[in-house]
Amino acid sequence: MAISLKVLAPNKNVYQGEAEEVILPSTTGQLGILPGHISLVTAIDIGVLRLRMNSQWKSIALMGGFAEIESDEVIVLVNNAEIGSEINVQNAEQDLKEAKLAISKFSENEKNPEKIKALKQVSKAEARIQAAKN
């Protein structure tokens, strides 16, 4: 038995297919989904969705959103997403370096909108790197 998985961003259908297992980065921690999972709606954090099919794992970098799990169907609606195998690691590592440099310009306890934006960019770059390397 398999799970039907759809990952949708505003501008594209990122992934549509079946999976034997799905691991989502929810805002409360990693959420593992197998066939027969209880119905659920959850917020998705910036992180990596992992799916297993035929003993092979695929990774998708997610940039926050929501997921609905119901009757062996998982629908993930996100702000943006990239399939790991399509991510340019060098670009993601450069983005990470630039975001960390931007953060270093602020004091540790400073609450500045630009610092918050840079912290989010760090999370996004790290998710992209992790998805690309898995």
Swiss-Prot record:
Keywords: ATP synthesis, CF(1), Hydrogen ion transport, Ion transport, Membrane, Thylakoid, Transport. Pfam families: ATP-synt_DE_N. SUPFAM superfamilies: Epsilon subunit of F1F0-ATP synthase N-terminal domain (SSF51344). GO terms for molecular function: ATP binding; proton-transporting ATP synthase activity, rotational mechanism. It comes from the Bacteria. GO terms for cellular component: plasma membrane-derived thylakoid membrane; proton-transporting ATP synthase complex. It is found in: Cellular thylakoid membrane. The keyword Membrane applies. It is a peripheral membrane protein. Its main location: membrane. InterPro entries: ATP_synth_F1_dsu/esu, ATP_synth_F1_dsu/esu_N, ATPsynth_dsu/esu_N. F-type ATPases have 2 components, CF(1) - the catalytic core - and CF(0) - the membrane proton channel. CF(1) has five subunits: alpha(3), beta(3), gamma(1), delta(1), epsilon(1). CF(0) has three main subunits: a, b and c. Produces ATP from ADP in the presence of a proton gradient across the membrane. Belongs to the ATPase epsilon chain family. HAMAP family: ATP_synth_epsil_bac (MF_00530). This is ATP synthase epsilon chain. The gene is atpC.
